[in-house]
Amino acid sequence: MPFLPITKEETEALGWDCPDFVLVTGDAYVDHPTFGPAIISRLLESKGYRVAMLAQPDWKTDRDFTRFGKPRLGFMVSAGNIDSMVAHYTAARRRRSDDAYSPGNRPGLRPDRAVTVYAKKIRELYPDSPIILGGLEASLRRFAHYDYWDDAIRPSVLVESGADLLTYGMGERQSVEIADRLAAGEPVSSLRDIRGTCYLIPTKEYEPGPAVDCPSYEQVCASKREYAISCRKQQDEQDAVRGKRLLQKHGKMLLVQNPPALPLDGAELDAIYELPYMRTWHPCYADQGGVPAIQEVEFSITHNRGCFGGCNFCAIAFHQGRMVTTRSEESVLREAKLLTQLPNCLLYTSPSPRDCS
């Protein structure tokens, strides 16, 4: 299956007047199932939607963001596979000299706090176009949070970015439901009941219902104890079965987190990982040496999602949930057979360390 279009000329060659969605990512375009933007774009494609890829746009000008014009349904925005600040800085707060998720290991091709910068640029250019945030950076910054690089509490990324919706955790279910409802003519402002999403509304517009109140942004800024209480409540409601809606005030606005999306079952995971990925970086990066991040995962196989561990140093349980779901043996074997047919295939694979727990 060919790569998804990355230029206006490619969309025109496909006979598109405009894409349904433009998926903006801070990583180079790698069509591989270990890259979140690849999964979401291929899944939407499988549902009949036209998706164009805008990888590492130049945020200092309008040119890249106007490449495809205004999409029919909206923009989906991700910083990429990791937080843009982690991509840019070491634990000593020093600027990194490389970026494995960029062509040729070249640093500086995405901005700091990428989802916020991208969303603001899109809002400036297309004020009425829906903007949906997703990916790790958006997901882990959805509440008021401590930022290591600022050494301060920052508000929800929804407050800073001005986006309409945020999908948190693994985003397949949410993305398809959002796409289907936008395609049916629902305004993005009405999409307030989708599991696995967050949104902002004026506090006075919130209709009371079963929910858990977190300490406000102002409270967590002023008190470490209130910050700890907020974090505990967020962790307590991460269960997809019993988790409740969470609320957190930011001034006159209210952040609403709907309960987590239900995890995909085995058959759904099989379908996701058997979508027609090209399983490598886009050929436009060939003369730059490709994208180094693919090297560790090119011949890997994802067997399961979720983790019961909840280790302090790891965000997997908070992002993927504690419920572990697995693919079928038949699906894993089909993928293994497919890998053996790829050029330069390594005829062995090993588990991720986290899967050995």
Model feature map: region roles:
Residues 153, 161-165, 336, 340-347:
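Conserved C-terminal portion of the radical SAM core fold
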Residues 268-277, 281, 291, 295, ...:
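Long hydrophobic segments that form regular secondary structure
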